[in-house]
Amino acid sequence: NISNYFLGIVSANEGYTDDAYNYFKKVQSLKNRHSKFNIEFVRTLVLLEKFDHAFAFSKKVWTEDELFFEADLLLGLDSFIKKDYEKAEKYFERLNKISRYNFFFEDFIGNVLIAWSKASQGNKEDSLKFIEKVPNTYHHLTQTQSCFLKCYFNSEDTKKSFEKLIQNKDYNFSRYNFFLINYLTF
């Protein structure tokens, strides 16, 4: 019933997530025919913190030949949580492809997540390489991620890296004093 779909969209846009979910449940047959439905339904599930349902639904609708940011992100995170890093990286790499259509995230989210996947596998060199792949547009964020990776690996230059970050005159990184202090006290 098309009215349930539209009522679900309106409810989601108005912030009535429970109502949106109830309407979307009634039109599950759209999942194989309408990608916008899949996006809205996954977002609704996440907002309702129905993560297991969101993971399961994403697996059902995911295909190799269709880029679906929300599904790739969720399936990548699910694989990461389960320590299946190779599979997680497959999904995270797709985020870089998807982000080419959205210049705000181009090569950002996927590379940062892959860097942390590499870090979780103990691969310091590759994790830092993936952070370096992030476009210069995000240099403030890559600086912080680089510091956190160095902290994660307990690198010798971690303290120096945090100090350089905090002393940056172009941007106020003073809130990272907290991380430096915690790093130094442990």
PLM ranges: what are they?
Residues 1-41, 47, 56:
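N-terminal leader/linker segments that initiate helical-solenoid repeat arrays
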Residues 10, 44, 78, 117, ...:
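Residue-level signature for tetratricopeptide repeat
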Residues 1-4, 31-38, 65-74, 102-113, ...:
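Generic helix N-cap/helix-start motif at coil->alpha-helix transitions
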Residues 14, 48, 82, 121, ...:
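Structural motif corresponding to the intra-repeat A-B loop/turn of tetratricopeptide repeats
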